[in-house]
Amino acid sequence: MNSTHHYEQLIEIFNSCFADEFNTRLIKGDDEPIYLPADAEVPYNRIVFAHGFYASAIHEISHWCIAGKARRDLVDFGYWYCPDGRDAQTQSQFEDVEVKPQALDWLFCVAAGYPFNVSCDNLEGDFEPDRVVFQRRVHAQVMDYLANGIPERPARFIKACLLYTSD
């Protein structure tokens, strides 16, 4: 089993799975993560993850796996994002939309042999999110995926991670 984790591995795995069929590439960025659809300057879609962080790459892949065709034509999938420093209500909304991506993160991390940690992503907020409650919600979604089936794109990525880590 491959016990070291480098972002280049995820780029190789993702691009081998999806670059041709979905015209999408995983790219290391130097700033905040963002999804950029193909345009006049770059002929392919880009999932740009933050600063070469392995966990960021996993998480951005999760968002891409959830986004439908129409959303994949929009910058950052057209998603709403409120930065760190959220109040209780906004944090609750943030966690609602993060359950499914973080459940995929968990599955991807297990397949890659990488430790998973939920992220409430609110270090500067005016209250402390209940990380345990959020983790239970994410875990429940993981169990739902396992019981009822993992969608095709995430299942393909999981299989590729498992094959890579078994070498």
Predicted segment positions?
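Conserved small/polar residues in nucleotide/adenosyl-binding loops
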Residues: 164-167
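Post-HEXXH active-site segment of zinc metalloproteases
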Residues: 68-98
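Short helix/loop segments within enzyme catalytic domains
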Residues: 108-122
